[in-house]
Regions:
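Flexible "arm" and connector segments at domain edges
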Residues: 1-68, 74-200, 204-267
Length: 267
């Protein structure tokens, strides 16, 4: 199959996509926009596509999920193409690295031993393997290797989990609740904008820790709260439109009453 045939091959799979990307990045005949992109310039798109995958999952839209997973795969192919051009890595070496990692992290699956390990022992092995991986990357500190690019709440929980492994953690949830109350007081007493900024961050960090102790994913919890707010406010708007009004023509008293009405209808 020649190159043009591969571009239009309906069942060309990953090789088809890799060839399309090479064509887009071709310095002589490629797309000017695609040619000038770098790891850094497409990084925001990589994050955006990952969130769009999550959005499709949460909406249970499987047709859209297929497309969004393709968009996310394109980001991996894009980074791989840039890496290949710079002699760093290519798509196949990326696949080999993650394959090796998965095999190494699952000795209970990929070894010849017939002895089954308990879930607790598997977790211990997993943590030991990850610790060895961090050491290989010279990540010797307890908090080394927690990605800076993670959503802030997710990163907070990961940092707290790492600290907890070495004993730096509150033993009971009541202690975390006391700290939440303390941080709220410090926020209300903050005088400057910079101080309020700092204290609000401290409060959010402790709330993430509270979520961790309660075994709640704070990112998912906040996403659910966002969806609930969107659903309820949209219903408030619908009720206003039905009355011949709009949010801008209404007032807080009326909208608050409608909000409580919507809440009551959900119960």
């Amino acid at each position: 199959m020649d190159n043009n045939d591969l571009i239009y091959a309906k069942n060309g799979g990953i090789e088809r996509l890799l060839h399309i990307m090479r064509s887009l990045r071709d310095p002589q005949t490629g797309c000017p926009w695609d040619i000038k992109q770098t790891f850094s310039s497409i990084a925001p798109y990589t994050i955006e596509e990952a969130y769009e995958v999550v959005d499709a999952i949460e909406r249970a839209d499987m047709a859209d999920l297929k497309g969004e997973l393709g968009d996310l795969l394109l980001q991996t192919v894009y980074h791989a193409a840039i890496g290949e051009e710079q002699g760093l890595f290519d798509f196949h070496s990326i696949a080999d690295v993650i394959s090796d990692k998965m095999v190494a992290r699952h000795p209970h699956v990929f070894t010849n031993s017939s002895q089954k390990k308990s879930k607790h022992k598997q977790t211990q092995d997993w943590e030991k393997i990850k610790e060895e991986e961090r050491k290989a990357l010279n990540q010797n500190g307890t908090l080394d290797g927690v990605a800076l690019g993670l959503p802030a709440l997710t990163r907070a929980v990961k940092l707290q989990n790492r600290a907890a492994r070495v004993g730096f953690d509150w033993p009971k949830v009541d202690s975390v609740l006391d700290k939440v109350s303390e941080e709220i007081i410090e926020l209300t007493e903050a005088k400057s904008a910079l101080h309020r900024h700092e204290e609000f961050g401290d409060l959010m960090f402790v709330l993430a820790n509270l979520a961790r102790h309660l075994k709640i994913d704070p990112e998912q919890s906040l996403r659910d709260a966002n969806k609930k707010f969107t659903r309820r406010f949209s219903e408030v708007e619908r009720k206003l439109y039905k009355k011949g009004s709009t949010p801008t023509l209404s007032n807080l008293t009326e909208m608050d009453a409608l909000w409580n009405e919507v809440k009551g209808e959900e119960k």
